[in-house]
Amino acid sequence: TDVGFDGWR
């Protein structure tokens, strides 16, 4: 739902 640093969340 939101890419922080790896591409997840």
From Swiss-Prot:
Q: Report which reactions are catalysed by this protein.
A: Endohydrolysis of (1->4)-alpha-D-glucosidic linkages in polysaccharides containing three or more (1->4)-alpha-linked D-glucose units
Q: How is the cofactor bound?
A: Binds 3 Ca(2+) ions per subunit.
Q: What is its EC number?
A: 3.2.1.1
What GO molecular functions are on record for this protein? Answer: alpha-amylase activity; metal ion binding
Q: Does this UniProt record's set of keywords contain Ion transport?
A: no
Cofactor(s), by name = Ca(2+)
Assigned keywords, A-Z: Calcium, Carbohydrate metabolism, Glycosidase, Hydrolase, Metal-binding
Share what the entry says about its subunit structure, partners included.
Monomer.
The entry's protein name is: Alpha-amylase 4
Q: What is the lineage of its organism?
A: Eukaryota, Viridiplantae, Streptophyta, Embryophyta, Tracheophyta
